[in-house]
Amino acid sequence: MLPAVGSVDEEEDPAEEDCPELVPIETTQSEEEEKSGLGAKIPVTIITGYLGAGKTTLLNYILTEQHSKRVAVILNESGEGSALEKSLAVSQGGELYEEWLELRNGCLCCSVKDNGLRAIENLMQKKGKFDDILLETTGLADPGAVTSMFWVDAELGSDIYLDGIITIVDSKYGLKHLTEEKPDGLINEATRQVALADIILINKTDLVPEEDVKKLRTTIRSINGLGQILETQRSRVDLSNVLDLHAFDSLSGISLQKKLQHVPGTQPHLDQSIVTITFEVPGNAKEEHLNMFIQNLLWEKNVRNKDNHCMEVIRLKGLVSIKDKSQQVIVQGVHELYDLEETPVSWKDDTERTNRLVLIGRNLDKDILKQLFIATVTETEKQWTTHFKEDQVCT
């Protein structure tokens, strides 16, 4: 088991780890269930957060509460795990066997010791018995790595889609975790989890003064200017706030357009820490030039700021206008992976086309990135060669 960080009271309340009441799963489906599952993609929501933040509490709440949602929950545990894991995971011949159990409120649950990919593949055999999938990561995991598997596994992608990333932050210890300095300039895990989130739950707000919650909220906003922040106690949250987010698909186009107009730029809360920058550039970009701009940032990693530090982009989101396309295009990026997808929203003939981008990362320089994007739209090669250092690739 991975060692806990901090004092013992950071850990989850043992009572909250108890296994929910289980009933045997039915192996047959009704015709209605089978029909409802055919041809429909299932949304997957990633639940992440530092050790003791309240991930298990949230999942136990979902698994036991009466909420009319049919949710499949995949618990990702390391080492000995909790009573919940011991009840759900069976090891045979040294290999893990996933046992899916149906709970009294209609939800499904299993526990795995790997990245959850195999569990999801097995779960799809029960398609029609659930409407949503929640995938928990370990406390020290980088959710970006888990996110990427939904983009690179084409076969799996035919059945599911990534709906969003939920990060839970402990009110009592969150500020300590987010400001912890790592050796060699590495980004600490808690900060990276917040940077990638679409929804941030500040949990256990009843355990600290209101002033401490405000400080934590300010720090979170300084890291991620795009995600929605919610305050909770004992991880109790309206499921409508964490499900059906459509944070990674074209259905978010309309709401994203409004949201990007109000995303604040942020200042780092520590030297060389993660910030959010946003800018708007009018015009149309050729798709090949847009790809080159993104690939230099995410793949080649050869873009540097005024201090000659490498820019590291953790999350990229935006709406762009591509030449010869009548639809607005949403761009999404997580670490090295990115995607361009047309939205249902068309550009109006009487309005100027524009591009709005939000980037979350480290050592980001808004002026340089905006200049590079202007060069992308106007096809000005000089601006590109000034800041793309092909012989000085960042590692």
UniProtKB/Swiss-Prot annotation:
| Stored Pfam families | cobW (PF02492), CobW_C (PF07683)
| Entry keyword annotation includes Nucleotide-binding | yes
From the record, which residues define motif CXCC motif? 107-110
Q: Where is there biased composition of kind Acidic residues?
A: 8-20
GO biological process, alphabetically ordered: protein maturation
State the span of motif (psi-PxLVp motif). 17-24
Q: Does this UniProt record's set of keywords contain Hydrolase?
A: yes
Q: What is its EC number?
A: 3.6.5.-
Residues annotated as binding GTP are 49-56, 110-114, 203-206
Q: What's this protein's family per the entry?
A: Belongs to the SIMIBI class G3E GTPase family. ZNG1 subfamily.
Q: What is this protein called?
A: Zinc-regulated GTPase metalloprotein activator 1E
User: What species is given as this protein's source?
Assistant: Homo sapiens (Human)
